[in-house]
Amino acid sequence: MAQLVQAPAPVPDPLREQLRMLVQRREQLVQQRDDERRRLHQATLAMVRACLIEQIGDLRRRIQRMNQAIKQVRCQLDDALAHALGTVPGIGEVTTASLMAYLPELGTLDRRQIAALVGLAPYNVDSGQHCGKRRIRGGRATIRRVLYMACWSVVRTQASFKERYQQLRARGKPAKVAITACMRVLLIRLNAMARDRTPWREVIG
């Protein structure tokens, strides 16, 4: 069974806290924008539609300003790490910032510890009804959501990840299980990159 990791509490960092608050606020603004877009799709009254269009435009501008602030703080926090993570296909500036804000332990733990910390380390469920089933539990749901979105981009663009995903699906694994396995591999790769401050390299063969 994978052991749940109780990582040492990171030393408080004012810049990291700023980054976390900016990322959280951006997430809120994106959610508001998406909600307004859905309302626009349903609205039929011209005045209501005009109001929604104006609101969506305002939210878009706020998100852009938040993106600029996130980029500035992220580079101040750790420019080398930001650059390394930014070389991963499918991982843009906001994803990089989310990893830096919500996972300060990245690069400081070994592969098993980082997987367990995030909640991507599988463990066996042995019982009279379910013998040998593999599950994941606990961990940081926010980081798993970030990795989930990023991993689909990596699977689409990187041959080794695409092959891994397809092999798992061919063996009868559900899509969720297959992408979770790829997320675990991606996290381990990111952890090594953060530790060594090295760029992404596609694994051939």
Give the residues covered by each predicted segment:
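Active-site catalytic microenvironments for nucleophilic, acid-base chemistry
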Residues: 4, 102, 106, 189
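Long, charge-rich intrinsically disordered scaffolds of nucleic-acid metabolism proteins
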Residues: 1-87
